Protein backbone atom coordinates (compact mmCIF):
# COMPACT_ATOMS: atom_id res chain seq x y z
CA UNK A 1 0.00 0.00 0.00
CA UNK A 2 2.95 2.32 -0.63
CA UNK A 3 1.36 3.99 -3.65
CA UNK A 4 -1.00 6.96 -3.43
CA UNK A 5 -4.46 6.42 -4.90
CA UNK A 6 -7.00 8.89 -6.28
CA UNK A 7 -10.64 8.71 -7.35
CA UNK A 8 -13.74 10.79 -7.88
CA UNK A 9 -15.86 10.12 -4.79
CA UNK A 10 -19.13 11.64 -6.00
CA UNK A 11 -21.53 10.35 -8.63
CA UNK A 12 -20.70 11.19 -12.22
CA UNK A 13 -22.87 13.79 -13.90
CA UNK A 14 -23.85 17.43 -13.66
CA UNK A 15 -24.01 18.75 -10.10
CA UNK A 16 -22.98 21.69 -7.96
CA UNK A 17 -20.06 19.95 -6.23
CA UNK A 18 -17.69 17.13 -7.07
CA UNK A 19 -15.26 15.55 -4.60
CA UNK A 20 -11.93 14.05 -5.59
CA UNK A 21 -10.25 11.95 -2.91
CA UNK A 22 -6.54 11.22 -2.51
CA UNK A 23 -5.00 8.74 -0.05
CA UNK A 24 -1.43 7.60 0.60
CA UNK A 25 2.08 8.65 1.56
CA UNK A 26 2.32 11.38 -1.10
CA UNK A 27 -1.19 12.82 -0.72
CA UNK A 28 0.01 15.96 1.09
CA UNK A 29 2.88 16.43 -1.39
CA UNK A 30 0.49 16.37 -4.36
CA UNK A 31 -1.96 18.74 -2.65
CA UNK A 32 0.77 21.30 -1.95
CA UNK A 33 1.97 21.15 -5.57
CA UNK A 34 -1.54 21.68 -6.93
CA UNK A 35 -2.38 24.55 -4.58
CA UNK A 36 1.04 26.25 -4.49
CA UNK A 37 0.81 26.14 -0.69
CA UNK A 38 3.72 25.44 1.65
CA UNK A 39 1.68 23.75 4.38
CA UNK A 40 -1.84 22.61 5.25
CA UNK A 41 -3.42 22.46 8.69
CA UNK A 42 -5.02 19.05 9.33
CA UNK A 43 -8.82 19.05 9.49
CA UNK A 44 -9.08 22.68 8.35
CA UNK A 45 -10.92 23.66 5.18
CA UNK A 46 -8.66 25.70 2.92
CA UNK A 47 -10.07 27.73 0.03
CA UNK A 48 -7.53 27.71 -2.79
CA UNK A 49 -6.92 27.74 -6.50
CA UNK A 50 -5.63 24.52 -8.06
CA UNK A 51 -3.03 24.63 -10.83
CA UNK A 52 -1.65 22.11 -13.29
CA UNK A 53 2.07 21.62 -13.94
CA UNK A 54 1.96 24.34 -16.62
CA UNK A 55 0.73 26.77 -13.97
CA UNK A 56 -2.72 26.93 -15.60
CA UNK A 57 -5.69 27.13 -13.25
CA UNK A 58 -7.83 24.00 -12.99
CA UNK A 59 -10.49 25.28 -10.60
CA UNK A 60 -11.11 26.94 -7.27
CA UNK A 61 -11.57 24.41 -4.49
CA UNK A 62 -12.04 23.75 -0.82
CA UNK A 63 -9.22 21.44 0.23
CA UNK A 64 -9.21 19.40 3.46
CA UNK A 65 -6.18 17.49 4.74
CA UNK A 66 -6.59 14.51 7.11
CA UNK A 67 -3.25 13.51 8.61
CA UNK A 68 -2.56 9.82 9.26
CA UNK A 69 -3.66 7.92 11.26
CA UNK A 70 -6.68 10.15 11.89
CA UNK A 71 -8.44 9.59 8.59
CA UNK A 72 -10.88 7.20 6.94
CA UNK A 73 -8.13 4.97 5.52
CA UNK A 74 -5.60 5.51 8.32
CA UNK A 75 -3.29 7.13 5.73
CA UNK A 76 -2.82 10.76 4.76
CA UNK A 77 -5.96 11.84 2.90
CA UNK A 78 -6.72 15.02 0.98
CA UNK A 79 -10.20 15.77 -0.32
CA UNK A 80 -10.80 18.38 -3.01
CA UNK A 81 -14.29 19.88 -3.17
CA UNK A 82 -14.54 21.39 -6.64
CA UNK A 83 -17.29 22.46 -9.02
CA UNK A 84 -19.40 19.63 -10.36
CA UNK A 85 -19.83 18.52 -13.92
CA UNK A 86 -18.26 16.04 -16.28
CA UNK A 87 -14.95 17.73 -17.05
CA UNK A 88 -13.43 19.53 -14.04
CA UNK A 89 -13.13 16.48 -11.80
CA UNK A 90 -11.68 14.43 -14.68
CA UNK A 91 -9.07 17.12 -15.37
CA UNK A 92 -8.08 17.19 -11.69
CA UNK A 93 -7.90 13.40 -11.57
CA UNK A 94 -5.67 13.32 -14.66
CA UNK A 95 -3.39 15.91 -13.07
CA UNK A 96 -3.06 13.82 -9.90
CA UNK A 97 -2.14 10.79 -12.00
CA UNK A 98 0.49 12.82 -13.87
CA UNK A 99 2.00 13.78 -10.49
CA UNK A 100 2.34 10.11 -9.57
CA UNK A 101 -0.96 9.00 -8.10
CA UNK A 102 -2.66 5.78 -9.22
CA UNK A 103 -6.34 5.46 -10.07
CA UNK A 104 -8.03 3.67 -7.18
CA UNK A 105 -9.71 0.33 -7.69
CA UNK A 106 -13.36 -0.16 -6.71
CA UNK A 107 -13.64 -0.08 -2.92
CA UNK A 108 -9.91 0.43 -2.43
CA UNK A 109 -10.29 3.24 0.11
CA UNK A 110 -12.47 0.99 2.29
CA UNK A 111 -10.09 -1.92 1.76
CA UNK A 112 -7.20 0.19 3.05
CA UNK A 113 -9.31 1.25 6.01
CA UNK A 114 -9.81 -2.43 6.89
CA UNK A 115 -6.17 -3.34 6.41
CA UNK A 116 -5.11 -0.41 8.58
CA UNK A 117 -7.51 -1.40 11.36
CA UNK A 118 -9.82 1.59 10.94
CA UNK A 119 -12.89 -0.60 10.52
CA UNK A 120 -13.89 -4.25 10.50
CA UNK A 121 -15.00 -5.98 7.29
CA UNK A 122 -18.49 -6.09 8.85
CA UNK A 123 -18.64 -2.31 9.15
CA UNK A 124 -17.38 -1.94 5.59
CA UNK A 125 -20.25 -4.14 4.39
CA UNK A 126 -22.70 -2.05 6.40
CA UNK A 127 -21.41 1.14 4.78
CA UNK A 128 -21.83 -0.35 1.32
CA UNK A 129 -25.34 -1.54 2.21
CA UNK A 130 -26.21 1.94 3.49
CA UNK A 131 -25.07 3.49 0.21
CA UNK A 132 -27.17 1.00 -1.77
CA UNK A 133 -30.21 1.04 0.56
CA UNK A 134 -33.47 1.43 -1.32
CA UNK A 135 -35.74 2.90 1.36
CA UNK A 136 -35.67 5.00 4.52
CA UNK A 137 -36.50 1.92 6.58
CA UNK A 138 -33.59 -0.02 5.07
CA UNK A 139 -31.24 2.85 5.87
CA UNK A 140 -32.51 2.89 9.46
CA UNK A 141 -31.83 -0.84 9.92
CA UNK A 142 -28.35 -0.64 8.43
CA UNK A 143 -27.43 2.52 10.37
CA UNK A 144 -28.40 0.72 13.57
CA UNK A 145 -26.11 -2.17 12.64
CA UNK A 146 -23.27 0.31 12.09
CA UNK A 147 -23.45 1.40 15.73
CA UNK A 148 -21.68 -1.84 16.59
CA UNK A 149 -24.45 -3.95 18.13
CA UNK A 150 -24.12 -6.72 15.56
CA UNK A 151 -20.33 -6.63 15.50
CA UNK A 152 -20.11 -6.74 19.29
CA UNK A 153 -22.51 -9.68 19.45
CA UNK A 154 -20.66 -11.70 16.81
CA UNK A 155 -17.30 -10.95 18.43
CA UNK A 156 -18.62 -12.03 21.84
CA UNK A 157 -19.78 -15.34 20.35
CA UNK A 158 -16.45 -15.80 18.60
CA UNK A 159 -14.54 -15.06 21.81
CA UNK A 160 -16.67 -17.57 23.74
CA UNK A 161 -15.89 -20.20 21.14
CA UNK A 162 -12.15 -19.43 21.15
CA UNK A 163 -11.96 -19.77 24.94
CA UNK A 164 -13.88 -23.03 24.81
CA UNK A 165 -11.73 -24.36 21.99
CA UNK A 166 -8.53 -23.52 23.87
CA UNK A 167 -9.75 -25.44 26.90
CA UNK A 168 -10.93 -28.44 24.90
CA UNK A 169 -7.71 -28.68 22.88
CA UNK A 170 -5.76 -28.61 26.14
CA UNK A 171 -8.01 -31.39 27.40
CA UNK A 172 -7.26 -33.45 24.29
CA UNK A 173 -3.54 -33.20 25.09
CA UNK A 174 -4.22 -34.39 28.62
CA UNK A 175 -6.82 -37.04 27.83
CA UNK A 176 -6.12 -39.01 30.99
CA UNK A 177 -7.56 -36.23 33.12
CA UNK A 178 -11.31 -36.40 33.45
CA UNK A 179 -13.26 -33.26 32.56
CA UNK A 180 -15.49 -31.94 35.35
CA UNK A 181 -19.10 -32.80 34.52
CA UNK A 182 -20.36 -29.34 35.46
CA UNK A 183 -17.86 -27.77 33.05
CA UNK A 184 -19.10 -29.96 30.21
CA UNK A 185 -22.61 -28.83 31.04
CA UNK A 186 -21.53 -25.17 30.91
CA UNK A 187 -19.89 -25.66 27.52
CA UNK A 188 -22.97 -27.47 26.21
CA UNK A 189 -25.21 -24.62 27.39
CA UNK A 190 -22.91 -22.03 25.79
CA UNK A 191 -23.03 -23.92 22.49
CA UNK A 192 -26.81 -24.19 22.58
CA UNK A 193 -27.29 -20.48 23.35
CA UNK A 194 -24.84 -19.21 20.72
CA UNK A 195 -26.17 -21.56 18.06
CA UNK A 196 -29.68 -20.29 18.79
CA UNK A 197 -28.61 -16.61 18.58
CA UNK A 198 -26.93 -17.11 15.20
CA UNK A 199 -29.91 -19.07 13.89
CA UNK A 200 -32.24 -16.24 14.92
CA UNK A 201 -30.06 -13.72 13.08
CA UNK A 202 -30.07 -15.59 9.78
CA UNK A 203 -33.72 -16.68 9.91
CA UNK A 204 -34.86 -13.16 10.81
CA UNK A 205 -32.66 -11.70 8.09
CA UNK A 206 -34.05 -14.12 5.50
CA UNK A 207 -37.69 -13.57 6.46
CA UNK A 208 -37.37 -9.78 6.52
CA UNK A 209 -34.90 -9.24 3.70
CA UNK A 210 -37.65 -7.45 1.78
CA UNK A 211 -37.35 -4.58 4.27
CA UNK A 212 -33.84 -3.94 2.98
CA UNK A 213 -33.83 -5.22 -0.61
CA UNK A 214 -37.43 -4.41 -1.46
CA UNK A 215 -40.26 -6.96 -1.46
CA UNK A 216 -40.59 -9.01 -4.64
CA UNK A 217 -44.19 -9.30 -5.84
CA UNK A 218 -45.23 -11.64 -8.64
CA UNK A 219 -48.55 -11.20 -10.49
CA UNK A 220 -49.86 -14.56 -11.66
CA UNK A 221 -52.96 -15.77 -13.48
CA UNK A 222 -54.13 -17.31 -16.71
CA UNK A 223 -53.95 -15.20 -19.88
CA UNK A 224 -56.17 -12.13 -20.26
CA UNK A 225 -57.38 -11.80 -16.65
CA UNK A 226 -55.96 -8.26 -16.35
CA UNK A 227 -52.48 -8.84 -14.94
CA UNK A 228 -50.92 -6.13 -17.09
CA UNK A 229 -53.72 -3.70 -16.21
CA UNK A 230 -53.02 -4.39 -12.54
CA UNK A 231 -49.30 -3.78 -13.05
CA UNK A 232 -50.00 -0.47 -14.77
CA UNK A 233 -52.40 0.56 -12.00
CA UNK A 234 -49.84 -0.20 -9.28
CA UNK A 235 -47.15 1.74 -11.14
CA UNK A 236 -49.56 4.58 -11.99
CA UNK A 237 -48.37 4.57 -15.60
CA UNK A 238 -48.66 2.25 -18.61
CA UNK A 239 -45.68 -0.07 -18.49
CA UNK A 240 -47.26 -3.19 -20.01
CA UNK A 241 -49.33 -3.57 -23.17
CA UNK A 242 -53.00 -4.17 -22.39
CA UNK A 243 -54.87 -6.18 -25.01
CA UNK A 244 -57.91 -8.40 -25.33
CA UNK A 245 -55.68 -10.91 -27.12
CA UNK A 246 -54.67 -13.70 -24.74
CA UNK A 247 -50.91 -14.25 -24.45
CA UNK A 248 -49.88 -10.65 -25.16
CA UNK A 249 -47.37 -10.76 -22.29
CA UNK A 250 -44.88 -13.49 -23.17
CA UNK A 251 -41.94 -12.44 -21.01
CA UNK A 252 -41.71 -11.29 -17.41
CA UNK A 253 -41.82 -7.52 -16.85
CA UNK A 254 -40.16 -6.19 -13.69
CA UNK A 255 -40.51 -2.68 -12.27
CA UNK A 256 -40.10 -0.99 -8.87
CA UNK A 257 -42.37 1.42 -7.03
CA UNK A 258 -42.89 2.80 -3.53
CA UNK A 259 -45.94 2.03 -1.39
CA UNK A 260 -45.72 4.14 1.74
CA UNK A 261 -42.17 3.64 3.04
CA UNK A 262 -41.74 0.28 1.33
CA UNK A 263 -39.96 -0.44 -1.93
CA UNK A 264 -41.76 -3.07 -4.02
CA UNK A 265 -40.24 -4.91 -6.96
CA UNK A 266 -43.19 -6.13 -8.98
CA UNK A 267 -43.12 -8.75 -11.73
CA UNK A 268 -45.88 -9.18 -14.31
CA UNK A 269 -45.64 -12.76 -15.55
CA UNK A 270 -46.81 -14.39 -18.74
CA UNK A 271 -50.24 -15.97 -18.49
CA UNK A 272 -49.99 -19.58 -17.32
CA UNK A 273 -51.75 -22.03 -19.63
CA UNK A 274 -51.03 -24.99 -21.89
CA UNK A 275 -49.59 -23.76 -25.17
CA UNK A 276 -47.81 -25.22 -28.21
CA UNK A 277 -46.18 -21.84 -28.91
CA UNK A 278 -42.48 -22.25 -28.02
CA UNK A 279 -42.03 -18.58 -27.07
CA UNK A 280 -45.12 -18.67 -24.86
CA UNK A 281 -43.89 -21.88 -23.22
CA UNK A 282 -40.64 -20.13 -22.28
CA UNK A 283 -42.67 -17.24 -20.83
CA UNK A 284 -44.72 -19.66 -18.72
CA UNK A 285 -41.52 -21.29 -17.42
CA UNK A 286 -40.18 -17.86 -16.44
CA UNK A 287 -43.49 -17.13 -14.70
CA UNK A 288 -43.14 -20.23 -12.52
CA UNK A 289 -39.54 -19.26 -11.69
CA UNK A 290 -40.74 -15.78 -10.66
CA UNK A 291 -43.21 -17.35 -8.23
CA UNK A 292 -40.35 -19.22 -6.54
CA UNK A 293 -38.36 -16.00 -6.10
CA UNK A 294 -41.28 -13.83 -4.96
CA UNK A 295 -42.02 -12.75 -1.39
CA UNK A 296 -45.66 -11.93 -2.20
CA UNK A 297 -47.97 -13.30 -4.89
CA UNK A 298 -50.94 -11.50 -6.45
CA UNK A 299 -53.14 -14.28 -7.87
CA UNK A 300 -55.53 -12.71 -10.39
CA UNK A 301 -58.81 -14.17 -11.66
CA UNK A 302 -61.49 -12.76 -13.96
CA UNK A 303 -64.89 -12.13 -12.35
CA UNK A 304 -66.57 -11.91 -15.76
CA UNK A 305 -65.51 -15.41 -16.87
CA UNK A 306 -66.64 -18.80 -15.58
CA UNK A 307 -63.96 -20.69 -13.66
CA UNK A 308 -62.22 -23.19 -15.95
CA UNK A 309 -59.33 -25.68 -16.01
CA UNK A 310 -56.76 -22.91 -16.45
CA UNK A 311 -57.99 -21.26 -13.24
CA UNK A 312 -57.78 -24.62 -11.50
CA UNK A 313 -54.15 -24.92 -12.58
CA UNK A 314 -53.40 -21.60 -10.89
CA UNK A 315 -55.01 -22.83 -7.66
CA UNK A 316 -53.03 -26.09 -7.90
CA UNK A 317 -49.79 -24.23 -8.61
CA UNK A 318 -50.18 -22.14 -5.46
CA UNK A 319 -51.60 -24.87 -3.23
CA UNK A 320 -48.37 -25.76 -1.44
CA UNK A 321 -46.56 -22.43 -1.40
CA UNK A 322 -45.64 -20.76 1.87
CA UNK A 323 -45.63 -17.32 0.23
CA UNK A 324 -48.14 -14.63 1.16
CA UNK A 325 -50.92 -14.68 -1.46
CA UNK A 326 -53.44 -11.94 -2.20
CA UNK A 327 -56.38 -13.47 -4.09
CA UNK A 328 -57.75 -10.90 -6.55
CA UNK A 329 -61.01 -11.03 -8.47
CA UNK A 330 -60.47 -8.52 -11.24
CA UNK A 331 -63.11 -6.96 -13.54
CA UNK A 332 -65.60 -6.99 -10.67
CA UNK A 333 -67.34 -4.00 -12.24
CA UNK A 334 -68.69 -6.43 -14.87
CA UNK A 335 -71.26 -9.17 -14.36
CA UNK A 336 -69.78 -11.59 -11.82
CA UNK A 337 -70.04 -15.22 -13.04
CA UNK A 338 -66.89 -16.56 -11.36
CA UNK A 339 -67.74 -19.17 -8.69
CA UNK A 340 -65.51 -19.10 -5.62
CA UNK A 341 -65.29 -22.89 -5.30
CA UNK A 342 -62.01 -22.67 -3.37
CA UNK A 343 -63.48 -20.38 -0.69
CA UNK A 344 -60.68 -17.85 -1.08
CA UNK A 345 -60.87 -14.43 0.54
CA UNK A 346 -60.92 -12.49 -2.72
CA UNK A 347 -60.24 -8.77 -3.04
CA UNK A 348 -62.77 -7.57 -5.59
CA UNK A 349 -61.64 -4.72 -7.82
CA UNK A 350 -61.34 -3.33 -11.32
CA UNK A 351 -57.69 -2.80 -12.25
CA UNK A 352 -58.67 -0.25 -14.87
CA UNK A 353 -60.75 1.81 -12.42
CA UNK A 354 -59.72 1.55 -8.76
CA UNK A 355 -57.26 -0.61 -6.80
CA UNK A 356 -57.35 1.37 -3.54
CA UNK A 357 -58.49 -1.66 -1.53
CA UNK A 358 -55.56 -3.77 -2.77
CA UNK A 359 -53.06 -1.02 -1.93
CA UNK A 360 -54.49 -0.75 1.58
CA UNK A 361 -54.30 -4.52 2.11
CA UNK A 362 -50.74 -4.61 0.79
CA UNK A 363 -49.61 -1.72 2.98
CA UNK A 364 -51.20 -3.23 6.09
CA UNK A 365 -49.34 -6.47 5.44
CA UNK A 366 -46.01 -4.73 4.81
CA UNK A 367 -46.40 -2.58 7.92
CA UNK A 368 -46.72 -5.75 9.99
CA UNK A 369 -43.00 -6.33 9.38
CA UNK A 370 -41.26 -4.41 12.13
CA UNK A 371 -37.61 -3.47 11.81
CA UNK A 372 -36.63 -4.53 15.32
CA UNK A 373 -34.09 -7.20 16.09
CA UNK A 374 -30.69 -7.67 14.50
CA UNK A 375 -30.90 -8.13 10.75
CA UNK A 376 -28.18 -8.33 8.13
CA UNK A 377 -28.46 -7.77 4.40
CA UNK A 378 -25.17 -9.28 3.21
CA UNK A 379 -25.82 -12.72 1.77
CA UNK A 380 -22.27 -13.71 2.68
CA UNK A 381 -22.81 -12.78 6.32
CA UNK A 382 -26.22 -14.48 6.45
CA UNK A 383 -24.57 -17.67 5.17
CA UNK A 384 -21.74 -17.29 7.70
CA UNK A 385 -24.27 -17.07 10.55
CA UNK A 386 -26.05 -20.15 9.20
CA UNK A 387 -22.85 -22.18 8.80
CA UNK A 388 -21.62 -21.14 12.26
CA UNK A 389 -24.94 -21.92 13.93
CA UNK A 390 -25.09 -25.38 12.39
CA UNK A 391 -21.42 -26.10 13.22
CA UNK A 392 -21.92 -25.12 16.88
CA UNK A 393 -25.07 -27.25 17.05
CA UNK A 394 -23.15 -30.25 15.69
CA UNK A 395 -20.33 -29.54 18.14
CA UNK A 396 -22.77 -29.71 21.06
CA UNK A 397 -23.83 -33.21 20.00
CA UNK A 398 -20.22 -34.32 19.60
CA UNK A 399 -19.38 -33.00 23.06
CA UNK A 400 -22.14 -35.14 24.54
CA UNK A 401 -20.59 -38.12 22.74
CA UNK A 402 -17.13 -37.17 24.14
CA UNK A 403 -15.77 -36.81 20.58
CA UNK A 404 -13.49 -33.92 21.51
CA UNK A 405 -11.40 -33.90 18.30
CA UNK A 406 -14.50 -33.58 16.12
CA UNK A 407 -15.97 -31.07 18.58
CA UNK A 408 -12.84 -28.92 18.13
CA UNK A 409 -13.10 -29.23 14.33
CA UNK A 410 -16.69 -27.93 14.28
CA UNK A 411 -15.88 -25.10 16.69
CA UNK A 412 -12.93 -24.08 14.51
CA UNK A 413 -15.26 -23.92 11.50
CA UNK A 414 -17.62 -21.55 13.33
CA UNK A 415 -14.78 -19.40 14.65
CA UNK A 416 -13.24 -18.96 11.21
CA UNK A 417 -16.60 -18.03 9.64
CA UNK A 418 -17.26 -15.32 12.25
CA UNK A 419 -13.67 -14.05 12.21
CA UNK A 420 -14.03 -13.12 8.52
CA UNK A 421 -16.31 -10.29 9.61
CA UNK A 422 -15.20 -9.38 13.12
CA UNK A 423 -11.40 -9.51 13.00
CA UNK A 424 -8.67 -7.83 10.98
CA UNK A 425 -7.17 -10.16 8.42
CA UNK A 426 -4.61 -10.04 5.62
CA UNK A 427 -6.01 -12.39 2.98
CA UNK A 428 -6.03 -10.09 -0.04
CA UNK A 429 -8.07 -12.42 -2.25
CA UNK A 430 -10.95 -12.28 0.24
CA UNK A 431 -10.68 -8.50 0.52
CA UNK A 432 -10.58 -8.14 -3.27
CA UNK A 433 -13.78 -10.17 -3.56
CA UNK A 434 -15.49 -8.24 -0.76
CA UNK A 435 -14.65 -4.73 -2.01
CA UNK A 436 -14.86 -5.42 -5.74
CA UNK A 437 -18.50 -4.29 -5.85
CA UNK A 438 -17.88 -1.04 -3.96
CA UNK A 439 -17.97 2.37 -5.64
CA UNK A 440 -14.83 4.04 -6.91
CA UNK A 441 -13.76 6.61 -4.33
CA UNK A 442 -15.14 4.43 -1.53
UniProtKB/Swiss-Prot annotation:
Its EC number is 3.6.-.-. Residues 214-367 form the TrmE-type G domain. One of its GO terms (biological process) is tRNA wobble uridine modification. K(+) binds at residues 224, 243, 245, 248. Mg(2+) binds at residues 228, 249. SUPFAM superfamilies: Folate-binding domain (SSF103025), P-loop containing nucleoside triphosphate hydrolases (SSF52540). It comes from the Bacteria. It is found in: Cytoplasm. Its cofactor is K(+). Its main location: cytoplasm. Keywords: Cytoplasm, GTP-binding, Hydrolase, Magnesium, Metal-binding, Nucleotide-binding, Potassium, tRNA processing. InterPro entries: G_TrmE, GTP-bd, GTP-bd_TrmE_N, GTPase_MnmE, MnmE_dom2, MnmE_helical, P-loop_NTPase, Small_GTP-bd. One of its GO terms (cellular component) is cytosol. Binds 1 potassium ion per subunit. GTP binds at residues 224-229, 243-249, 268-271. Belongs to the TRAFAC class TrmE-Era-EngA-EngB-Septin-like GTPase superfamily. TrmE GTPase family. Exhibits a very high intrinsic GTPase hydrolysis rate. Involved in the addition of a carboxymethylaminomethyl (cmnm) group at the wobble position (U34) of certain tRNAs, forming tRNA-cmnm(5)s(2)U34. PANTHER family: TRNA MODIFICATION GTPASE GTPBP3, TRNA MODIFICATION GTPASE GTPBP3, MITOCHONDRIAL. NCBIfam families: mnmE_trmE_thdF, small_GTP. Homodimer. Heterotetramer of two MnmE and two MnmG subunits. This is tRNA modification GTPase MnmE. It comes from Campylobacter jejuni (strain RM1221). The lineage of its organism: Bacteria, Pseudomonadati, Campylobacterota, Epsilonproteobacteria, Campylobacterales. The gene is mnmE.
Amino acid sequence: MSDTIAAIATAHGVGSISIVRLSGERALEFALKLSHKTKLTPRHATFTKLFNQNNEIIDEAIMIYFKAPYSFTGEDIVEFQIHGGFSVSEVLLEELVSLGARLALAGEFSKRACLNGKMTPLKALNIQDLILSKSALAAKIIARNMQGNLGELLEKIRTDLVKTLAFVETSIDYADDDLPSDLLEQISTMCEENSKILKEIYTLSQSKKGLIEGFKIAIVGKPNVGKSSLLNALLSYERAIVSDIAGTTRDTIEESFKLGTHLLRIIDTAGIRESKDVIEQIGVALSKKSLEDADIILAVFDASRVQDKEDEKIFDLLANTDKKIFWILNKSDLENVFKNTQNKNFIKLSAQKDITLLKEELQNYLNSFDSEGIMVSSLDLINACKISSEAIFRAKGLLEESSLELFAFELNLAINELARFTKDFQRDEILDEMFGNFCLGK
